[in-house]
């Protein structure tokens, strides 16, 4: 089920502003907004309310054992996060994207489908990297 201000249907059980009605001891909530700043704002609201923000990693995604993935980040099918990457909170690592070794992806970044982030880049907070884009080695220096 989910909360949504615009969508309708059986799975929609309320508006986003109703979130506190669904808070229980073990409740986890993910702010599934495509707008990076809105997602970060909602992450803060949920965190301030002591609601757990899960890490959602698809079974077909690969995350290196030496990589770190922050709370409230989603890693979608066939995405790859290589060695020593730090993915901060609230990011979307979309389908088939590759984050090469040693990258830092700051909070709220959306890496679109099929994107390649080459090694040793620091992608700034709330940036959206468009689908299929290749970010060259050290284009955003660490």
Say what each PLM segment does:
Residues 31, 35, 39-57:
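Glycine/small-residue-rich loop that forms an oxyanion/phosphate-binding "nest" at active or ligand-binding sites
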Residues 1-33:
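A solvent-exposed beta-alpha-beta segment
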Residues 20-24, 44-48, 66-67:
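Short, charge-rich binding segments
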Residues 12-13, 48, 72-74:
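Short, hinge-like loop/turn segments at secondary-structure boundaries
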Residues 8, 37, 62-63:
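Short secondary-structure capping/turn micro-motifs that flank functional sites
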Residues 56-142:
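Structural signal for interior beta-strand "rungs" in well-ordered beta-sheet cores
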Residues 9, 26, 50-51, 132:
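A generic structural signal for alpha->beta connector loops
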């Amino acid at each position: 089920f989910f909360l949504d201000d615009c969508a309708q249907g059986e799975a929609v059980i309320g508006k986003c502003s109703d979130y506190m009605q669904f808070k229980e001891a073990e409740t986890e909530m993910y702010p599934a907004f495509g707008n990076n700043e809105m997602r970060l704002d909602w992450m803060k609201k949920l965190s301030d309310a002591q609601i757990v923000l899960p890490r959602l990693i698809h079974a077909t995604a690969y995350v290196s054992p030496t990589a770190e993935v922050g709370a409230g980040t989603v890693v979608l099918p066939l995405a790859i996060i290589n060695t020593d990457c730090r993915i901060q909170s609230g990011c979307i690592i979309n389908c088939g994207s590759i984050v090469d070794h040693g990258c830092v992806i700051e909070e709220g970044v959306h890496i679109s489908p099929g994107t390649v982030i080459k090694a040793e880049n620091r992608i700034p907070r709330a940036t959206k990297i468009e689908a299929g884009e290749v970010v060259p080695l050290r284009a955003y220096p660490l």
